């Protein structure tokens, strides 16, 4: 299932995954609604708004009344649904801010997740990590329940680090599937029935480089395989 409030990204999602249900507002989404619709959850992924965290914004933080304060809704869903894994993304300044109390925003993220029984790994992975032509710094936060931590010995063997070292040394952006088929324009897209220049640029600004969450997904699968082999 998807949860997306903006119309243009919803159209893009519907184009690529027409049979996947979409919900509009994370503030209204609940475990009961998902259960009613027959949806079970193993993984939650999300990028909560960055406008109040980014160095380009006013850095109002993640408190109540801010757009970035939708983090609280992400946390609520993790606590209610108890997924095996939760993966969140935001701008790198989440690690550093606010200016008057460096690190306080991220300390809250860690405290919130620990408070509902989740351990956390995090990595600052820019797009250039996989060879893209721009930096696009982002922090990726992988949370997993304490039960998984005990089963996999995660505290001694982080899920992500080994996979990241492997990928960075063996694979470049040009080698990813479909890389040779990119359109000539890397901003405005093509006349594909969906693209609208203004909305597309805004959506690209809010989007992620998909190869990075794919890499993280493979790292999770590797950890699961290792645990099964050791069992």
What role is predicted for each listed range?
Residues 219-223:
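Active-site catalytic microenvironments for nucleophilic, acid-base chemistry
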Residues 1-29:
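SAM cofactor-binding core of SAM-dependent methyltransferases
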Residues 213:
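Acidic-aromatic/histidine active-site loop/patch
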Residues 48:
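Glycine-rich, N-terminal phosphate-binding loop of Rossmann-like dinucleotide-binding domains
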């Amino acid at each position: 299932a998807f949860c997306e409030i903006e119309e243009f990204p919803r159209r893009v999602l519907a184009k690529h995954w027409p049979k996947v249900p979409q919900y509009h507002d994370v503030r209204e989404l609940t475990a009961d609604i998902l259960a009613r619709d027959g949806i079970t959850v193993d993984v939650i992924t999300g990028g909560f708004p960055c406008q109040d965290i980014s160095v380009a914004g006013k850095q109002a933080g993640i408190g109540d009344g801010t757009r970035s304060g939708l983090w609280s809704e992400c946390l609520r869903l993790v606590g209610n649904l108890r997924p095996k894994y939760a993966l969140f993304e935001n701008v790198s300044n989440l690690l550093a801010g606010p200016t008057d109390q460096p690190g306080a925003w991220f300390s809250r993220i860690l405290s919130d997740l620990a408070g509902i029984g989740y351990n956390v790994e995090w990595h600052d992975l820019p797009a250039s990590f996989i060879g893209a032509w721009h930096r696009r710094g982002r922090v990726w936060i992988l949370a997993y329940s304490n039960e998984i931590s005990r089963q996999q010995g995660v505290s001694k063997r982080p899920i992500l680090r080994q996979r990241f070292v492997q990928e960075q040394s063996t694979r470049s952006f040009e080698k990813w599937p479909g890389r040779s088929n990119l359109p000539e324009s890397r901003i405005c897209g093509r006349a594909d029935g969906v693209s609208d220049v203004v909305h597309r640029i805004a959506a690209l600004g809010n989007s992620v480089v998909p190869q990075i969450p794919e890499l993280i997904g493979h790292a999770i699968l590797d950890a699961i395989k290792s645990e099964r082999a050791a069992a």
